[in-house]
Every structure is written in structure tokens, then in C-alpha cells.
């Protein structure tokens, strides 16, 4: 990713007591060697180089974030998380540390924490004017989507359990009433009367069951997984756009978000970095029509 955020230390070691120079590589040289290995996708070897750099100079945040990225590539989020936390102890403004920490937490399904760190990384990148392209926004969209899906799965499971519980209650109540009817008419010679009462009990509980199933079928759409397509979400807030507008570069933003960006950050397109002024923003009426239709058909988006 682009953007140089930390000042890196690790000067060469001095001469030894005997006056002969120390031939071992410096922390910076080890870091550069690790970078070359990383480019070659030799992640374990790169992580080892960054580890040696840390041993030589444990006070440089970038060594930890570089090793954390190796661990992420090797699908070892716990080790990556530890390195990210150490990097943040050294440099609380590190974009990469927050970004990689968010990715670790995303892998570990800690979605709220992941979103918080990814949002912090995005804010810091804007403040420091570092260009990470769509890397951070993309990770943030994924984290929000996974958190939403997790909430939806839990809700669907709870509704399914409720349906099963009510079904068992109705069936148990039916059996109890049928048994009570049988006991109350033991010895009666009029079997027709007993059968009529039992038929009434059966019909009553069949109606209970049918009414309940109808009620659940009416909310069937709510049981399904719900999602907002990425193309309807703003590229700054990552929320459903309400007033989409398009830039000369062809990128669509929510108006309030892009205007805030222009006022607080600078007069350029956040994605393409092209010069941009508020007067160049044009309402995207076609997208607005699509969004309005989506909202009208999916009332749940207000809670998304």
C-alpha cells in the first residue's frame, strides 16, 4: 500500500571494543531485506527479518506493522494483533497499525472492534493525507457487512427457536385437552358426543397452528438475510447514500460527505485525488431513483 507514515530508526551499530567494525546488518538493513522477501511472497522469511530488526531496535513501530502484515498473510491473526498493539504503543497515530489491527479483529470475528479501528485508520489517513486507495474503505465495508450478517443470523435463529417453541406449546396443549376430554367422559355410552368434542379441540388447535404459521410467513422477508449493495453506499461514510452526486471523475458520493471532505481535508477527489470543487458536484438523479426505490421496498434499511 502507498503512504509512508512512520520515521524509521535503526542506525548502523558502532565499532566494537577492539576497534574493528561490526559486520552484522543494521535494523534498517534487516527491514529492507524483509521488504524484498515480502515482495517475493516469502512471508515467513520476511517476518523473521522484521523480527531481527525488532531485536536490534525495538522502538520502531513500522517494524511491528510490517511483521503484522506478514502474519496476516500467513493467516495468523493473533500474532499480527500483538504486533499491531505494540506498534500503537510506540505510535498511536500509525495508520497501518490501526488498519492491520482492524483486519486482525475482522478475521477473529470481533466486528465492533474491527470497525472502530478501521474507521480510525481511515480518519488518520485523511488527516495525514496518505493515499491508501480503496484498501481501508473496502475492509470497512466488509467488516460492516459481516457484522450485519452476524446480527441477522442471530435474529433468524431466535425467530426459528420461537416458532419451534410455540409449535410445541400448541401441540402439548392439544394433547392435554384431548386427554382431559377422554377422562371426563370415561364410561359414557355416547361415543358420538366424545368424538364431537375431540374434533372441536383438534379444530381449535389446528387454527392456532395455522394462524401462527401465517403470522410467521408474513414476516418471512425479515427472516431472510438483508443487505445493502455496495454500489448504493457512499465511499466516505460507507452508509446508504441519501443525496448522491457525481464528480467529473465519475465517482458518486453522498453530498454531505463529499462537501465535508472538501471543506475539512482539501479540494480533491478522495478516490482519484483529482482537483475538485463543490461547484463541480452534479446530482446523480439516476442513482437517487434507484436508492429511493430500494428504500421503499426495504423498510429495514433505516435500522441498518
Curated annotation (Swiss-Prot):
Main location: cytoplasm
GO molecular function, one term: enzyme binding
PROSITE patterns reported for this sequence: TPR, U_BOX
Region: Required for ubiquitination of FOXO1, residue numbers: 144-304
Stretches for region Required for interaction with and ubiquitination of MYOCD: 143-197
Note on domains (UniProt): The U-box domain is required for the ubiquitin protein ligase activity. The TPR domain is essential for ubiquitination mediated by UBE2D1.
Name of the molecule in the record: E3 ubiquitin-protein ligase CHIP
Protein's gene: Stub1
Amino acid at each position: 500500500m502507498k503512504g509512508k507514515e512512520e520515521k524509521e530508526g535503526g542506525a548502523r551499530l558502532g565499532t566494537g571494543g577492539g576497534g574493528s567494525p561490526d559486520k552484522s546488518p543494521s535494523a534498517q538493513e534487516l527491514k529492507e531485506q524483509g521488504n524484498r522477501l515480502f515482495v517475493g511472497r516469502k512471508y515467513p522469511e520476511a517476518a523473521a527479518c522484521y523480527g531481527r530488526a525488532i531485536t536490534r531496535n525495538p522502538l520502531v513501530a513500522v517494524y511491528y506493522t510490517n511483521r503484522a502484515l506478514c502474519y496476516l498473510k500467513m493467516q495468523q491473526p493473533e500474532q499480527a494483533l500483538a504486533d499491531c498493539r505494540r506498534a500503537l504503543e510506540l505510535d498511536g497515530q500509525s495508520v497501518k497499525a490501526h488498519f492491520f489491527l482492524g483486519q486482525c479483529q475482522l478475521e477473529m470475528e470481533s466486528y465492533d472492534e474491527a470497525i472502530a479501528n478501521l474507521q480510525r485508520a481511515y480518519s488518520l489517513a485523511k488527516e495525514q493525507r496518505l493515499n491508501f486507495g480503496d484498501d481501508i474503505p473496502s475492509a470497512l465495508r466488509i467488516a460492516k457487512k459481516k457484522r450485519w450478517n452476524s446480527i441477522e443470523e442471530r435474529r433468524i435463529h431466535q425467530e426459528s427457536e420461537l416458532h419451534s417453541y410455540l409449535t410445541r406449546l400448541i401441540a402439548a396443549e392439544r394433547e392435554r385437552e384431548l386427554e382431559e376430554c377422554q377422562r371426563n367422559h370415561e364410561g359414557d355410552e355416547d361415543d358420538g358426543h366424545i368424538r364431537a368434542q375431540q374434533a372441536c379441540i383438534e379444530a381449535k388447535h389446528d387454527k392456532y397452528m395455522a394462524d401462527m404459521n401465517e403470522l410467521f410467513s408474513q414476516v418471512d422477508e425479515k427472516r431472510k438475510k438483508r443487505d445493502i449493495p455496495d454500489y448504493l453506499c457512499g465511499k466516505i461514510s460507507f452508509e446508504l447514500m441519501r443525496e448522491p452526486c457525481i464528480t467529473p471523475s465519475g465517482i458518486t458520493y453522498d453530498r454531505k460527505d463529499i462537501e465535508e471532505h472538501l471543506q475539512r481535508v482539501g479540494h480533491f477527489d478522495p478516490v482519484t485525488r483529482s482537483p475538485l470543487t463543490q461547484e463541480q458536484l452534479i446530482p446523480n438523479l439516476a442513482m437517487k431513483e434507484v436508492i429511493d426505490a430500494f428504500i421503499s421496498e426495504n423498510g429495514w434499511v433505516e435500522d441498518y
